[in-house]
């Protein structure tokens, strides 16, 4: 992996200002999986222990629908640089207005406002999707994500202590929630 110079960072930041958020297409899925797999070794974002494949995750991708539980990508200059998806929180009818969201950003574009833009879009468009409550499940040691959700009006609604075992370390899972 090459280092990012300050000149490279400026050009990436300029590109970030021109983000388009759109529905994900199957064509985007290999890039979506690459972004996801890059987080696996960090042990900060996902409970997956090994990278996954497009084939293994395609059924999950196909469960989304643009009108209720969309899957969006953030695109800049024709390149997918991040994504956000809505999932059913629980399968019971009374939870119909609650969605769990996940957001992932290409490692070269992190800390440049991509996740914030995706989350703001989710908050803003949630009601038109029939969503009244958004929940994010975030590892308690993932402080950057917790701070971002906090800045966007999410509150810590719960903590599941020691629920995930990553490399022989038990990790807590924070439940962040917000009405929209």
What residue ranges belong to the model's regions?
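Conserved GNAT-fold acetyl-CoA-binding loop/helix
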Residues: 33-60
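A short beta-loop-alpha structural element at the N-terminal edge
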Residues: 20-32
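Conserved GNAT acetyl-CoA-binding A-motif
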Residues: 126-138
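C-terminal "cap" of GNAT-fold acetyltransferases
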Residues: 18, 99, 162-180
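Conserved beta-strand-loop-alpha-helix junction that forms the acyl-donor binding cleft
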Residues: 110, 136-146
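Conserved acetyl-CoA-binding loop-helix of GNAT-fold acetyltransferases
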Residues: 111-124, 147-151
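Conserved catalytic-core motifs of GNAT/GCN5-like acyltransferases
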Residues: 88, 135-138, 150, 155-172
């Amino acid at each position: 992996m090459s280092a990012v110079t300050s000149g490279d960072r400026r050009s990436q930041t300029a590109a970030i200002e021109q983000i388009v958020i759109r529905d994900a297409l199957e064509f985007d899925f290999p890039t979506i999986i690459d972004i996801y797999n890059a987080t696996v070794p960090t042990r900060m974002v996902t409970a997956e222990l090994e990278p996954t494949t497009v084939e293994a995750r395609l059924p999950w991708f196909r469960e989304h629908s643009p009108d209720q539980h969309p899957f969006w990508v953030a695109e800049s200059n024709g390149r997918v640089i991040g994504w956000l998806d809505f999932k059913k929180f629980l399968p019971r009818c009374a939870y119909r207005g609650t969605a769990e969201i996940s957001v992932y950003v290409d490692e070269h574009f992190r800390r440049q406002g991509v996740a914030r833009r995706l989350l703001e879009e989710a908050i803003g468009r949630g009601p038109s999707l029939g969503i009244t409550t958004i929940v994010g499940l975030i590892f308690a040691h993932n402080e950057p994500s917790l701070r971002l959700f906090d800045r966007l009006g999410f509150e810590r609604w719960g903590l599941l202590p020691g629920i995930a075992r990553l490399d022989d370390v038990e990790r807590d899972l924070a439940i962040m929630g917000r009405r929209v």
